[in-house]
């Protein structure tokens, strides 16, 4: 997950790390519940939930508070919607709140600092509902643990089917990826695995898992199966893209089943795969992995925000490496001084020990000072976090700038002038014979387009899709204001619907020269949107592609923080892409560019 979030396409299937964690969590939690029932014939939900709070809350809440405080100090885009992010994460409903606000998990350049808390929310919701179901069946209805396994498998199948049915190929998959209903199968597969590996010993201090019974008695078979299972899982990490249809219609659940095989082999502690996971470094990374996961996203965003004006601060591999170092240090400190004491002694006893370190008769001056610094730092973080949440902004600096440009654009085009009757056969020197229709990327380049083509008619707005173009073109035609050259700048907010771009081109007509910008960005649909421009330029003699994508890909450091919108010199690059396309038209030599970056 860390590599996936910080280094983009280096590990396309890195998001599967969450599903590994889901299967493992479902397995461990259900093992605890079943083991307690086997030796005591009851399940203490109160004690179970107290243990979960002790395990999860210290790291989760401390990271929230500290990072919210840092975000408040840094300010800017990391502070956007901080209150909503904070409270939805603290209450473990982050996934549903993000779904409600149409936040895309797969638009990595706009990932909020607490977006990754979605998986923690799914787990916590499972930790509330699943123990109730297990307790009802085992304690009240007196069913067997094997029935729990069958029910878990049934639930996993239903959840996976829901994901496969609801997912809409070619559209953002965040809904099914974030949804507890559609992404619970990993947790349930882990639960099913627990039901067939749990020990039947009635001794309280007996083994949790039965190594000579159930599934685990087949140690040699498990060790042999684990080798290809691990190989396939590694292959998935490098191959299974987050927008592939197969991912949501078999990929994620098959990965979860593979992980279950690996876990069974590791628990049986037999074979080469189990030996790999006995490595001391991997074991320690496992201990701090929870905090590492919580810290890596905000740490990276803080680094990017603080140093985005430096050239090195725009290079993902540099900021990513720095973020990993910071996250490892923060995770280690959290594990040693926050998570472990509270997990061992509880909140009250940990507070008592801290108080003794400060005020106890045997405490040294150094211990008192160190002990006093902890609550002082906690109070300070809470104050700054509260101020940051209270002063949260509801839009990024880029969004505010685009709103300003949009207001200017609307006022400037209040009166549309009729198109000139003179037809030029060379690259136009001004914009009196050019209409430009587009989205926020064109809007961000408005000033440079007007500078290069004085008199150009620009109609660009934020969040605009191809869907808005037909009505605008019809309106221009009705006013006799559709000019010889028409610039189209779409694709940022989605590819055209089937046949939509053809409809737009035909409505403009073959007597007009159409130049379409090749869109750029990290959105899941971007390559499809680019391919549509390429296909249109090849299909229609009067359509040319403005290769904005190639320029943006070579000058990412010149883009805004979202790495989509141009700023400064990049607006010149955007404008020059249209100029280059017009030169192709004037020379009669069309050169249709490929999509960028190249399809894998």
Located regions from the model:
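Active-site flanking residues adjacent to catalytic metal/cofactor-binding acidic residues
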Residues: 18, 438, 488, 546
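Extracellular/periplasmic envelope-modification machinery, especially enzymes
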Residues: 240, 308-314, 318, 336, ...
């Amino acid at each position: 997950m860390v590599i996936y979030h910080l280094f983009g396409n280096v590990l396309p299937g890195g998001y599967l790390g969450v599903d590994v964690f889901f299967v493992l969590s479902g397995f461990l939690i259900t093992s605890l519940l079943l083991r307690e029932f086997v030796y005591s014939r009851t399940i203490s939900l109160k004690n179970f939930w107290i243990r979960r709070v002790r395990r999860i809350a210290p790291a989760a809440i401390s990271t929230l508070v500290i990072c919210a405080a840092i975000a408040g100090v840094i300010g800017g885009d990391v502070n956007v919607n901080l209150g909503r992010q904070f409270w939805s994460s603290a209450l473990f409903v982050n996934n549903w709140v993000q779904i409600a606000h149409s936040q895309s998990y797969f638009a990595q350049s706009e990932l909020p600092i607490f977006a990754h808390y979605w998986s923690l929310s799914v787990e916590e919701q499972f930790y509330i509902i699943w123990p109730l179901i297990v307790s009802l069946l085992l304690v009240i209805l007196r069913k067997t643990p094997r029935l729990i396994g069958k029910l878990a498998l049934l639930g996993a199948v239903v959840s996976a089917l829901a994901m496969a049915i609801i997912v809409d190929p070619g559209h953002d998959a965040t809904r099914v990826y974030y949804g507890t209903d559609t992404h619970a199968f990993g947790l349930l597969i882990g639960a099913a695995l627990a039901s067939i590996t749990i020990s039947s010993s009635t001794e309280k201090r007996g083994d949790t898992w039965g190594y000579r019974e159930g599934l685990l008695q087949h140690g040699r078979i498990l060790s042999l199966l684990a080798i290809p299972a691990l190989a396939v899982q590694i292959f998935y990490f490098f191959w299974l893209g987050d927008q592939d249809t197969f991912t949501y219609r078999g990929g994620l659940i098959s990965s979860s089943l593979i992980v279950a095989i690996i876990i069974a082999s590791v628990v049986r502690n037999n074979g080469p795969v189990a030996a790999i996971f006995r490595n001391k470094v991997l074991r320690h990374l496992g201990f701090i992995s929870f905090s590492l996961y919580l810290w890596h996203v905000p740490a990276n965003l803080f680094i990017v925000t603080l140093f985005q004006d430096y050239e090195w601060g725009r290079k993902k591999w540099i900021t990513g490496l720095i973020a990993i170092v910071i996250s490892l240090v923060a995770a280690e400190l959290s594990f040693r001084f926050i998570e472990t004491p509270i997990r061992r002694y509880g909140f009250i006893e940990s507070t008592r020990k801290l108080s003794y370190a400060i005020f106890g008769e045997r405490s040294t001056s150094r211990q008192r000072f160190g002990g006093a610094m902890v609550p002082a730092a906690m109070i300070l973080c809470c104050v700054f976090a509260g101020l940051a949440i209270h002063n949260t902004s509801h839009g990024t600096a880029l969004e505010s700038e685009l709103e300003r440009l949009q207001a200017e654009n609307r006022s400037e085009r209040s009166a549309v002038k009729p198109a000139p009757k003179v037809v030029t056969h060379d690259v136009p020197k001004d914009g009196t014979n050019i209409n430009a229709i587009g989205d926020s990327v064109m809007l961000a380049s408005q000033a440079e387009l007007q500078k290069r083509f004085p008199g150009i008619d620009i109609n660009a707005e934020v969040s605009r899709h191809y869907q808005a173009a037909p009505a605008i073109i019809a309106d221009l035609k009705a006013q006799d204001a559709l000019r010889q050259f028409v610039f189209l700048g779409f694709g940022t907010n989605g590819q055209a619907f089937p046949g939509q771009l053809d409809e737009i081109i035909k409505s403009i007509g073959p007597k007009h020269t159409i130049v379409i910008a090749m869109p750029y960005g990290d959105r899941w649909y971007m390559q499809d949107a680019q391919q549509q421009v390429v296909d249109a330029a090849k299909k229609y003699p009067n359509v040319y592609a403005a290769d904005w994508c190639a320029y943006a890909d070579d000058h990412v450091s010149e883009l805004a923080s979202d790495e989509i919108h141009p700023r400064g010199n990049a607006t010149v690059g955007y404008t020059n892409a249209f100029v280059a396309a017009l030169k192709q038209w004037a020379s009669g030599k069309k050169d249709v560019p490929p999509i960028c970056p190249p399809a894998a």
